[in-house]
């Protein structure tokens, strides 16, 4: 991503992630804010390039030391660490050797997981292997809008497979090093609906569901790759003996990232997967132009519960971007985000009442941050960041979220 963000035309406004919200230097202040908001868990990612920057496996101890300090401080504050091993930041040296389309990257990821587990496993129980592998594979290798910026179906499918294999190898490494580890994977999922009742749109919705949801759930939950999508992609999966057993190793929980539903129509003008998203009917959209649709979160929680038999779920990301501004009094009023949070927490409460084993909810995000290809224009944080001064200001949504976190209750109902 460092290389990608420094490539002209890849990120809005020419923004890069060089400094972003400078959490690397300001983490004590940021954890202090998390404590003030009453958060009892903190989800963060560990940067593979900080730990093993080169392809030779040499460990950068300074990188590990940062996460060591972060972990100890979280525990001192009574905040449970929830690290993710991979949030899209592949070492450039590994990309130069082929990246996720080649098997070596999955193997190196397993070795990196061993290093991190050995360093932090004595204090951290809860682990996620991958965050939104769909984005790494489909958006990075098929759509070309994220690193490494390819538009190659074969590379995308092979990347998806090796991401799953890397997940399995990481699970193996974590289990070996941390006997009491609670391990999951984080997928961004969306309910997919046909735009009309036509056969073409219904088939498009089936393909969309396969591309967005089933391809990412079925293999890790023991169902194998969905055959309709294997045939649609027409790319041979590079399966070796024993791979599928690794990929489908038992997990302790599933992480669900939810932002919007997808309404689709058929589109066979380009390569697979032959569907195109169309605008939803709701008039309310976020600054990302994403439709606000809380019931979709309830639907996904119940699908994981009823269709897949998942025994423990975390909502690992849910949030919204709006055009926040700092008022003359120095405060940031964002009633739209507050309403968004309450609507989606209500969806969680409904799902729990219907049997969903929801164990926790993480808002995206604590701070405004570098929003990948969108740069710094899109603000998701409960805390406003002035990128020129790095001043943090808790938004009104952050204060409301703190109230909800303290009460575990929303409008008379117990929230997740």
Can you describe what each PLM-predicted range is?
Residues 1-60, 64, 70-73, 77:
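N-terminal structural segment of carbohydrate-active enzymes
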Residues 2-11, 54-55, 65-416:
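Active-site region of glycoside hydrolase catalytic domains
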């Amino acid at each position: 991503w460092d290389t990608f963000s420094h490539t002209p035309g890849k990120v809005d406004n020419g923004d890069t992630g060089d400094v972003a919200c400078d959490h690397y230097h300001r983490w004590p202040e940021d954890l202090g804010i998390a404590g003030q908001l009453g958060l009892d868990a903190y989800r963060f990612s560990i940067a593979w390039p900080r730990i093993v920057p080169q392809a030779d496996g040499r460990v950068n101890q300074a990188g590990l030391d940062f996460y060591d300090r972060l972990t100890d401080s979280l525990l001192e504050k009574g905040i449970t660490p929830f690290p993710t091993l991979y949030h899209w930041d592949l070492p450039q040296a590994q990309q130069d050797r082929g990246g996720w389309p080649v098997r070596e990257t999955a193997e190196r990821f397993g070795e990196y997981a061993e290093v991190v587990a050995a360093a932090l496993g004595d204090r951290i129980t809860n682990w996620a292997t991958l965050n939104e592998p769909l984005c790494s594979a489909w958006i990075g290798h098929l759509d070309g809008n994220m690193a490494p910026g390819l538009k190659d179906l074969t590379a995308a499918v092979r990347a998806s497979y090796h991401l799953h294999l890397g997940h399995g190898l990481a699970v193996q490494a974590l289990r070996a090093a941390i006997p009491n580890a609670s391990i999951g994977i984080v997928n961004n999922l969306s309910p997919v609906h046909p735009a009309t009742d036509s056969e073409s749109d219904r088939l498009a919705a089936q393909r969309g569901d396969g591309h967005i949801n089933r391809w990412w759930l079925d293999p890790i939950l023991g169902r194998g790759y969905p055959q309709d999508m294997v045939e649609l992609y027409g790319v041979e999966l590079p399966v070796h003996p024993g791979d599928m057993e690794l990929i489908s190793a038992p997990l302790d929980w599933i992480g669900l990232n939810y932002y919007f539903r997808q309404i689709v129509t058929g589109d066979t003008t380009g390569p697979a997967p032959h569907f195109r998203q169309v605008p939803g009917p709701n008039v309310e959209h976020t600054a990302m132009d994403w439709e606000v649709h809380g019931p979709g979160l309830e639907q996904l929680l119940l699908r994981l519960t009823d269709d897949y038999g998942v025994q423990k779920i975390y909502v690992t990301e849910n949030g919204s971007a709006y055009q926040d501004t700092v008022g003359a009094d120095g405060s940031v009023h964002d009633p739209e985000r507050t309403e968004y949070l309450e609507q989606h927490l209500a969806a969680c409460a409904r799902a729990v009442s219907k049997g969903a084993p929801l164990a926790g909810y993480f808002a995206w995000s604590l701070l405004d941050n570098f929003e990948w290809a969108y740069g710094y224009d899109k603000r998701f944080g409960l805390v406003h960041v002035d990128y020129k001064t790095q001043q943090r200001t808790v938004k009104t949504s952050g204060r409301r979220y703190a109230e909800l976190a303290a009460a575990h209750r929303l409008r008379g109902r117990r929230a997740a």
